[in-house]
Amino acid sequence: MNSRRLGGLTAAALLSVGMSLGAGLAAADPGDYTVLLIDPNVVTGSLAYTAPPPVLNPGGQPGAMTIYTHRDGRTIADTVWVLGDPGAAAGAISSAQAATPVANSKTVSVPVGQNGQLVTGKSPDGTRSLSVLYFTEGNAAASLEFTGPAGDPVPQDLVVEFGQKQDALIKSQLGT
């Protein structure tokens, strides 16, 4: 499996989080969940981000995931899982948080979706800043991972704005 680095994580690690959710996740109706991913170019009003085609059903779980790369090297990994019920969504977030290594981490509640949590710190090797936003919305679970230079983390207000737009997109597409 390709193990492209995402700050403290790899794409393979993100996919394995999805796989580890396993039997606790009921299958949602099949569909093109890539419409649930928010494009950072829309949020920032720029064309500075590029992304490969999204991965449908990452780790075999219903949902979508992609990695946006800014021309300056910053990345945003956007993952949305669509699960059987809100309890499964909350469980997915717990599993994702447990699988995300953030050094010198600080966690704060943020006004995004249901139970929005922002974890900030550095990649385990200390070379990148890392901010990961987790939230649920109905039966959907979302993880947004922002990486950048170690001394220049993404501003919290931008993470919250991005998360709120991601939440609004989930609501509009899933009717939650």
Name every feature range the model reports, one short phrase each.
Residues 1-13:
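N-terminal export and membrane-targeting signals
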Residues 6-7, 17-35:
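C-terminal region of N-terminal signal peptides and the immediate post-cleavage residues
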Residues 37-58, 87-133, 168-176:
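Short Gly/Thr-rich strand-loop-strand
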Residues 62-69, 129-137:
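Short, surface-exposed beta-strand/loop micro-motifs that present aromatic residues
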Residues 65-93:
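A short acidic-to-branched-hydrophobic micro-motif
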Residues 77-78, 139-148:
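Short, well-ordered beta-strand elements
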Residues 83-87, 147-152:
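A generic structural motif
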Residues 149-176:
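Surface-exposed amphipathic alpha-helical segments
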